[in-house]
């Protein structure tokens, strides 16, 4: 088998006193995401998609929130570490398609920077990374601006 697909998901609560970081981009907003690391839900979902594609579990298995080494960790560092795990096993990312669901803030103005970061971390062209922003039409906890959710799918291929 030369190709595999993985799916990833993450959600974090919005709270006062935290920076909002998505796709490695700091987004101006009065609240940020709560988490052990920088709580970048987008990168966590992408990391899970990549790990899942090669049956390596999920982000919590490799970078547990019980480990003080990952307190406040930059999720871009974790994503690059996941890519290295794939490479050790003979796999590389081909493309990623991700969706961020947030009532606020508007994410489209930050999409180009997020795509550039993800592409750089995965070692692929920006035209192989797609990031979409959606609202939840004011429904549920996402619509009440209590959290931000991320979903991602990744295609990987065997190298060599």
Swiss-Prot record:
CDD domains named among the record's database cross-references: MECDP_synthase
Keyword tags: Isoprene biosynthesis, Lyase, Metal-binding
GO terms (BP aspect): isopentenyl diphosphate biosynthetic process, methylerythritol 4-phosphate pathway; terpenoid biosynthetic process
Disulphide bonds in the chain: none
Record's keyword annotation contains Hydrolase: no
Gene3D superfamilies assigned: 2-C-methyl-D-erythritol 2,4-cyclodiphosphate synthase
Molecular function GO terms recorded: 2-C-methyl-D-erythritol 2,4-cyclodiphosphate synthase activity; metal ion binding
Pathway(s) it belongs to: Isoprenoid biosynthesis; isopentenyl diphosphate biosynthesis via DXP pathway; isopentenyl diphosphate from 1-deoxy-D-xylulose 5-phosphate: step 4/6
Annotated site, Transition state stabilizer, chain positions: 36, 135
Binding site for 4-CDP-2-C-methyl-D-erythritol 2-phosphate: 10-12, 36-37, 58-60, 63-67, 144
Cofactor(s) needed by this chain: a divalent metal cation
Top-level EC class as recorded in UniProt: lyase
Cofactor, free-text remark: Binds 1 divalent metal cation per subunit.
Catalytic activity reported: 4-CDP-2-C-methyl-D-erythritol 2-phosphate = 2-C-methyl-D-erythritol 2,4-cyclic diphosphate + CMP
Protein family per UniProt: Belongs to the IspF family.
Primary role: Involved in the biosynthesis of isopentenyl diphosphate (IPP) and dimethylallyl diphosphate (DMAPP), two major building blocks of isoprenoid compounds. Catalyzes the conversion of 4-diphosphocytidyl-2-C-methyl-D-erythritol 2-phosphate (CDP-ME2P) to 2-C-methyl-D-erythritol 2,4-cyclodiphosphate (ME-CPP) with a corresponding release of cytidine 5-monophosphate (CMP).
UniProt cross-references to HAMAP family, sorted A to Z: IspF
Name this polypeptide is given: 2-C-methyl-D-erythritol 2,4-cyclodiphosphate synthase
Species of the source: Dechloromonas aromatica (strain RCB)
């Amino acid at each position: 088998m030369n190709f595999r697909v993985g799916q990833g998901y993450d959600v974090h609560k919005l709270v006062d006193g935290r920076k909002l970081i998505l796709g490695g981009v700091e987004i101006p907003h009065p609240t940020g995401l709560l988490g052990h690391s920088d709580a970048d839900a987008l990168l966590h979902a992408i990391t899970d998609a990549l790990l899942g594609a090669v049956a390596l579990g999920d982000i919590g298995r490799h970078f547990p929130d019980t480990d003080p080494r990952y307190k406040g960790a930059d999720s871009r560092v974790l994503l690059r570490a996941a890519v290295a795990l794939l490479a050790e096993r003979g796999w590389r990312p081909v493309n990623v398609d991700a969706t961020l669901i947030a009532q606020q803030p508007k994410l489209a103005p930050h999409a180009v920077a997020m795509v550039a970061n993800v592409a750089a971390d995965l070692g692929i062209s920006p035209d192989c990374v797609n990031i979409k922003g959606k609202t939840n039409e004011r429904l549920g906890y996402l619509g009440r601006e209590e959290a931000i959710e991320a979903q991602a799918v990744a295609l990987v291929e065997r190298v060599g």
